[in-house]
Amino acid sequence: MSKARASTVVHVPRRFVAEEWGGTETVILEISRQQQRAGGTPVIMTSMALARQRNEIIGGVLVKRYPYCYPFFGLSADDRAALDKKGGNLLSLSLFYALYCEPKVRLFHAHALKRLGGEVRTAARLRKKPFVVSLHGGVFDVPAAELGTMLKPIENKMEWGKPFGALFGSRKVLEDADFVICVGQSELEKAKRILTHDRIAYLPNGVDCAKFTTGDGAAFRAQHGIPPDAFLVLNISRIDAQKNQALLLEAFARFRLQEPKAFLVLIGPETQPSYAAKLRELVVTRQLDRQVKILPGMRNDQPELVQAFHAANVFVLPSMHEPFGIVVLEAWSAGRAVIASRVGGLQALVRDGETGLFMDPNAPTAVADLAAQLARLAGDPGFCKALGEAGRREARAHYDWEQIGRQLEDLYRLAEEHRKQHA
């Protein structure tokens, strides 16, 4: 990564806690580390959502947190918890004030929209600093069903926070941004059609190839009672309807009729407790309780995370919607074959039959199709290994974080140039 000026890049996600880790957290942490190596002083400024302490060092990067609320009348504790987990449109005046006062700011990097994005926009404008926005979870490419799930906690609730949205220009964030970064190609194409400016670029997520190259898969199997000769199917993602683990469970049940020794491991934080309950019920009704392990989400620095990839024979990501799919890069770096949904950013990431296999999660035959692909890989170990090795080469050649960091620095400079021209 090119030498950056010794000033602060302020990253602003909606929440950031080690115990509820996902792709967005990985991206923010890794690009912050790249910025540190280049001489910069990144800081993560966020809300107290799901957190127990105000300030914390995570992975060598300072995280500052601030009180917040959801400005709706009538929210229950369960509603607030659901909004914390996913999609909550929060308000934090103390965070806004901190953004306004943070010293030596070079640039603001928003990793959220809505009111929080508006706070970043307004702080940047008041301070005459550039700001960029990354679209991690998708904005223009989100299925209606998923959007409805995210909005359910505020259904029929009176919102008293609209004046703050107007004050902070929440609906102008993307139009006013000095640069908009899309992690998925499909999101990029839609953003170019909808936004009135051309300050938009595709920048994929990256992976720490070295971290995932080696791992003790045998130790993971032994810890969780999985025989050494079992064909192990792995999914690591949020336990959420978007991630579609129910389809994987149904396909696995069918696959086990051909491969009785097969095991399935699901790992991830439960962002939809009701969906997690549905999965556990499905495990029981399909009589899979001895062959399926549902494990809680793991911290990014847990050795067991890497061990899980190396324990697996195949990694499956059956998402209904996926802007990018950073876990595919992690599976590739571990040399594991991948089966992924032909949706969103995955369509540009995976080459069918070369670096992975595609499945259509919306097809009437999706369960049978996925079961057949699992059977194909289990029955042809050579092909399974070749897919994994091709993925490893792809990750090393195009997605190492150092490369992504250099490209991000180029976008920062374009954002700075735009801000100078429009000061």
How does the language model describe each region?
Residues 10, 227-243, 249-252, 265-267:
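Conserved donor-binding/catalytic core segment of Leloir-type glycosyltransferases
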Residues 118, 126, 139, 157-179:
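Membrane-proximal helix-turn-helix segments that form the acceptor-binding/catalytic region
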Residues 186, 206:
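Carbohydrate-associated surface elements
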Residues 276-299:
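Nucleotide-activated donor-binding/catalytic signature segment of Leloir-type glycosyltransferases, i.e.
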Residues 297, 307-312:
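Short alpha-helical donor nucleotide-sugar binding micro-motif in glycosyltransferases
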Residues 320:
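Aromatic "clamp/platform" in nucleotide-sugar-dependent glycosyltransferases that forms part
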Residues 337-340, 350:
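Short hydrophobic beta-strand element within catalytic cores of glycosyltransferases
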